[in-house]
């Protein structure tokens, strides 16, 4: 049955085609508990920087039905199969079809480190290269004690914490690039990328906390995310100027961010961090965060002669 699968590019401006594409991802979220497409992938597909692919099968009973969805381009590949159609070989067939037109090295995420993704990766020449820990906090508190700690942390060593202001864009992007110089996604954000996120329905300037030194320079930030109707809040991105280390700024920002999420009515907080960032892992563990899930990034490297590389 898997050989009846077809790959095509849906028109996301068409309501029916867009619904079919995103319905596959929604079905996976309902079963797996996490989104198969991260935020950057969704922004890229809506902006046209990457291409959506829908995998459909044809049957006499249902005619053409979307059973898989992928987002490809810019050296990245994301693929998900509707849980109702897993275990039938569709994932392998879809991946072969996507790889047939791919050029150069590819990276792919397995959100939640799904066992089936490990098998597909192994069979198609992908090797694990990164692990992101998804951590979850204990119950958040807006109590006087917690608020007092965070407020005290807002004013130490000449550093103050306040919301993002209009005009901070260029300085923030420059600092973000330095903080995440070796980070494949976060470090390459542009002012346009920043503004695209600020245009999202969940954005509030008061959730974007900026640490400034006594001269008004940005030395760190904690951008928290409180999506409408969500119980969990998120430490969306937290960073401290590499030239401003060891002064407790990161901890102060994190406490202020957790306080802000509690003010927004969120009962817990989540965060994604690199598994090999031992100092960040230690800080979050000290503040009661525990591991919830793991995301694994795979890479498929192609040598100059077109053969797979295993190093």
Predicted feature descriptions by range:
Residues 62-68, 216-220, 279:
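Glycine-rich acetyl-CoA-binding "A-motif" of GNAT/NAT acetyltransferases
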Residues 1-43, 149-187, 309-311:
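Short amphipathic alpha-helix that is part of the acyltransferase structural core
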Residues 124-146, 255-311:
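Active-site/acyl-donor-binding loops of N-acyltransferases
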Residues 87-101, 237-240, 246-263, 281-286:
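Conserved acetyl-CoA-binding loop-helix of GNAT-fold acetyltransferases
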Residues 36-53, 70-75, 185-240:
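A conserved beta-strand-loop-helix scaffold within acyl/acetyltransferase catalytic domains
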Residues 1, 73-78, 83-158, 296-300:
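Acyl-donor-binding surface of acyltransferase catalytic domains
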Residues 81, 238-240, 273:
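Hydrophobic adenine-recognition pocket in adenosine-nucleotide-binding enzymes
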């Amino acid at each position: 049955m898997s050989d009846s699968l077809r790959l095509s590019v849906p028109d996301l401006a068409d309501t029916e085609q867009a619904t079919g594409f995103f319905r596959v991802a929604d079905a996976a979220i309902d079963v797996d508990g996490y989104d198969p497409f991260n935020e950057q992938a969704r922004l890229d597909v809506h902006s046209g920087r990457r291409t959506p692919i829908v995998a459909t099968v044809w049957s006499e009973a249902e005619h053409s039905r979307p059973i898989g969805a992928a987002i490809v381009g810019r050296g990245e590949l994301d693929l998900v199969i509707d849980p109702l159609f897993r275990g039938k070989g569709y994932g392998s067939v879809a991946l072969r079809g996507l790889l047939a037109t791919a050029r150069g090295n590819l990276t792919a995420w397995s959100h939640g480190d799904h066992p089936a993704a490990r098998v597909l990766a192994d069979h198609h020449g992908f090797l694990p290269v990164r692990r992101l820990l998804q951590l979850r906090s204990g119950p958040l508190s807006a109590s006087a004690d917690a608020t007092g700690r965070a407020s005290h942390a807002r004013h130490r060593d000449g550093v103050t914490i306040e919301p993002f202001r209009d005009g901070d864009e260029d300085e923030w992007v420059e600092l973000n690039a330095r903080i995440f110089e070796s980070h494949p996604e976060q470090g390459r954000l542009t002012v346009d990328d920043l503004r695209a996120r600020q245009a999202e329905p969940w954005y509030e300037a008061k959730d974007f906390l900026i640490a400034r030194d006594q001269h008004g320079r940005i030395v760190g930030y904690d951008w928290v995310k409180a999506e409408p109707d969500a119980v969990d809040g998120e430490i969306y991105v937290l960073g401290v100027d590499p030239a401003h280390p060891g002064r407790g700024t990161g901890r102060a920002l994190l406490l202020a961010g957790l306080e802000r999420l509690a003010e927004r009515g969120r009962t817990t907080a989540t965060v994604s961090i690199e598994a090999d960032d031992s100092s960040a892992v230690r800080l979050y563990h000290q503040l009661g965060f525990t591991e919830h899930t793991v995301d694994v990034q795979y890479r498929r490297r192609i040598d100059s002669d077109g053969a797979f590389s295993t190093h």
